[in-house]
Regions:
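A structural motif corresponding to the C-terminal end of an alpha-helix
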Residues: 55-62, 93-102, 165, 209-217, ...
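Active-site gating/metal-coordination segments in enzymes
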Residues: 62, 68-201
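Hydrophobic faces of well-ordered beta-strands that scaffold small-molecule active sites
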Residues: 16-20, 64-66, 103-106, 135-137, ...
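Short glycine-enriched loops at secondary-structure junctions
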Residues: 20-22, 173-178, 290-291
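Short, acidic/polar
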Residues: 47-56, 115-126, 268-273
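Conserved, mostly hydrophobic/aromatic
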Residues: 19, 56, 91, 126, ...
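An N-terminally biased module of ancient metal coordination in phosphate/nucleic-acid-related enzymes
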Residues: 2-65
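H/E-rich (His + Asp/Glu) clusters that bind or coordinate divalent metals
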Residues: 53, 186-206, 214, 218-304
Length: 304
């Protein structure tokens, strides 16, 4: 199931929305929005399947891949594992009821839950029993000085399992504060931090050699990779001076193995830049619905 998004089955659809969230009814979305300085469009809350289907029809989207922002903070606990399982079974039930309109990326438990192999169990369950199209992961796990980016060796067993399955991974930047506050209420974490967190995670995968160690994992970077297309060359030029053993050419080659989706990034200069950077089949369509849906979103949906 995990590879069909990039192969034969994708040809059956006019447009696939690779970045489409679902919000369970027990999620206090308004509260979590307030924590990061974001306002989900009021008409999209409380979220329902009909709201997504209506938006998909408006944008000529045939298939949406549902995902829930990864569990990037918290503790290794039964509650955390239960939350991941419940969300995955909820998403799978939607796909079962509407197989021609939805697929889903599975949510993993807090990724540090490696020692108890809970994340590995959830990977097996969601692929083998729920038929997930891939998994959704965060750029880092934990908070503050103990936050760990996803290329860390502690996560190697997870990457090894995903590599063995030739899995699709949807990588979304964490909504975590930087060491300085965001500069203005109109420039909250989704604007100032998430794009850079995506870049930091992608760059971490590259310079640690993780991307080369697990080459069969197909990684999609949310929001056109955030700042990745514009900073990849900076990594290539400077990281050797800080101990990276890869050549600049190898670094750029590894950045080009990622897939880049267009949510909140489908501005013509951005698209022109990414088309110069990666092959066209590595550029995917995404909307970030229902977190956002504006006239601009719909406008660019018809231009891609």
């Amino acid at each position: 199931m995990s590879t069909t998004l990039f192969a034969r089955d994708a040809k059956r659809f006019r447009r696939i929305d690779i970045h489409h969230h679902y919000f369970p009814s027990n999620l206090e979305k308004e509260k979590s929005n307030a924590d990061v300085g974001w306002r989900t469009p009021a008409e999209n809350l409380p979220w329902s399947l009909d709201i997504s289907l209506s938006a998909m029809d408006a944008m000529n989207v045939d298939l949406a891949i549902l995902s829930f922002p990864a569990l990037s903070s918290g503790f290794i606990s039964k509650d955390n594992r239960h939350t991941a399982r419940t969300r995955n079974e909820f998403a799978a039930s939607i796909c079962h009821a509407h197989p021609s309109r939805f697929g889903f990326f599975a949510t993993l438990p807090f990724l540090d839950d490696v020692e108890g192999i809970c994340s590995l169990h959830e990977i097996a369950y969601t692929f083998d029993e729920l038929h997930a199209n891939g998994v959704s992961i965060s750029s880092s796990y934990g908070e503050g000085v103990v936050a760990t980016y996803i290329g860390d060796k502690r996560y190697d067993p997870i990457w090894a399992e995903l590599n063995k399955r030739q899995a699709v991974v949807f990588l979304h930047g964490s909504q975590i504060p930087s060491s300085t506050p965001y500069p203005h209420p109109c420039l909250g974490l989704p604007i100032t931090e998430v794009p850079n967190e995506t870049f930091k995670a992608a760059a971490h995968l590259v310079v640690t050699g993780n991307r080369r160690k697990f080459p069969d994992v197909r990684i999609i970077l949310a929001h056109l990779g955030g700042s990745t297309p514009f900073l990849a060359s900076r990594v290539a030029v400077l990281s050797n001076h800080m101990g990276c053993i890869l050549t600049p050419e190898e670094i750029l080659d590894d950045f080009k193995t990622f897939y880049y989706e267009t949510a909140l990034s489908a501005y013509e200069p951005n698209l022109a830049a990414i088309e110069k950077f990666v092959q066209h089949d590595h550029i995917l369509f995404g909307t970030d619905f229902p977190g956002t849906f504006t006239r601009l979103t719909a406008f660019y949906a018809f231009r891609i």
